[in-house]
Each structure stands twice: as structure tokens, then as C-alpha cells.
Amino acid sequence: MSRRGTAEEKTAKSDPIYRNRLVNMLVNRILKHGKKSLAYQIIYRAVKKIQQKTETNPLSVLRQAIRGVTPDIAVKARRVGGSTHQVPIEIGSTQGKALAIRWLLGASRKRPGRNMAFQLSSELVDAAKGSGDAIRKKEETHRMAEANRAFAHFR
């Protein structure tokens, strides 16, 4: 056993304008090549577009979208006796949020549109309503876990 202490889990910092951790998690996932100011610009433009589209609080739309996309359970490949099984595992809240953000960004990148802010705002609004590619991805993951429920004892 290691003599070193266990690493403390870092809490996500909040962004400067909205003081929201989810916004900061989004910024850190959208970030490419260290261009954080560009990532902030994209997020803030998307939030502004959400405000224009829905005429409600954009942060509540963001929260609702992430809550809707967050999976409760996922499958993990586990090799048992020469064959690989997809074993369903429960997901914690932090990991679930991280997955939800990754899926939302992936779905928004695939969307047709002028720029990333427009694509992201459209995907977030759709996810808050309960439609869109990110929601489909969550449902697909839940279906996979349900189909492989017989292998749950391999954990």
C-alpha cells in the first residue's frame, strides 16, 4: 500500500461573470489549444442566444439541459474468461455531469450552424426540452445498461 496521502479531490472553480461551476466546466471542456478567452466568448454568446430564444434565465436552461442529459448508469467493458462483457455500473454525480457536458458539446459540434455558440445554444435548448442528440445518447447508454443487466454481478 502506498505511504503517500490520498490526493484531495479538487472542486471546480466558478466562472467570473455568472459565478457558476457548470459554466466553468463547460468552458474547460470546450477549450482548444489553451485558448480560454475564446472558450469564454463562445459560452457567453451561447448563453446570450439562449436568453433571446427562450426569454427565461439561461442558467436555469443550462442546468435543466445538463440534468436531463446526465446518465445514472453506464456500461464498462470487462474481460471475463476470454470474452468481453459490457458490465453496467452506476455513475456518481460529478462523473455524470462531466459525461453530460462531453455529450452536449459533441452533439453541438455535429450540428449544422454558423458558429459554435449558435450550435451550442440550440443543443442546450433542445436538451432542456428533452430532445436532441445528447438526450438520444443518454437513452442509448441506458438501453445498453438495461440489455446487459445480466452481467451486473461481474463488478
Curated annotation (Swiss-Prot):
Main subcellular localisation: plastid
GO annotation, cellular component aspect: chloroplast; small ribosomal subunit
Gene Ontology biological process terms from the UniProt entry: translation
Subcellular locations according to the entry: Plastid, Chloroplast
Molecular function in Gene Ontology: rRNA binding; structural constituent of ribosome
Function, in words: One of the primary rRNA binding proteins, it binds directly to 16S rRNA where it nucleates assembly of the head domain of the 30S subunit.
NCBIfam families, sorted: rpsG_bact
Protein name, UniProt field: Small ribosomal subunit protein uS7c
Organism in which the protein naturally occurs: Coelogyne cristata (Orchid)
Name of the coding gene: rps7
